[in-house]
Amino acid sequence: IILPATTPLERNDIGASSRDRFVMAMKKAVAPQGEARHDFDIFRGLAKRVGVEREFAMERNEMEWLRTLYETARQRASEEAGEIPDFDTFWANGYVETDMPETPYIVYSEYRSDPDGEKLPTPSGKLEIFSETIDSFGYDDCIGHPVWMEPVEWLGDAAPEQLHLISNQPGNKLHSQLDHGAVSRANRPKGVEPVTMHIDDACARGLKEGQIVRLHNARGACLGELRTSDTIRPGVVQMSTGAWLDPDGDLCRGGNPNTLTLDKGTSRLAQGPIAHSCLVRVQARSGSWRR
């Protein structure tokens, strides 16, 4: 089931981060488009269907919840950040600037200064190199202490023509958001996500700068616009994630590396992504490729 949710431009919200000195009033710019609804309204409707609307919403609407969250944070922050304006003043002004501490925050500094009084939230209260808790799970892919385990795919076990794909976060958008925007499009004038390869690897494959290439493995394939470099490691290709999927059979014409990466977790415990454990082959694209 897919329910259309509003974008940040279609709802009111508060923007903040634990390391920023500004708290921003994110005011709705336009009414929700089509049948889109605020996430809160969607879940409130679902809660009503199962008879727990009152427990979920606590008799507050969108703005009442923003006010409650702000005032709660304001009360807690007053001890460290000084006097902070009330919600009405904050919302009218559009932002609040808090006082920055005289010394920068250093992670675990309190613990290092007073390890007995400032214990960490671990069973021992200390930094644990070995975890009895994790070890007790009996997971063969995540034991109780750090250890190197051979990746499913890596250059140490690659065929001669295979390359290791790094699909990092893009520098011109957040994940895949606004991939259709001018800033993102400017990075791919041919409409295809760039892929960077060491110039020696490109020469060995008869490939040239600006050429449209096909990256592929047993899981799928995508196109990329080749960019050569002498600073990337030989045997490695780099293609940022975030291109919107543009499928043509098992091929993504836009250059989405998710068509190539493994859909597996790091371990039974963590279940993090292993997108960087990915081997591909790269060759010239033959025939029509334009989107």
Outline where the language-model segments fall.
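Short acidic, glycine/serine/threonine-rich loops at helix termini
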Residues: 1, 13-17, 177-178, 227, ...
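Structural motif
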Residues: 1, 162-164, 194, 236-237
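Long, contiguous, secondary-structure-rich segments that constitute the structural scaffold
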Residues: 33, 39-90, 175, 182-196, ...
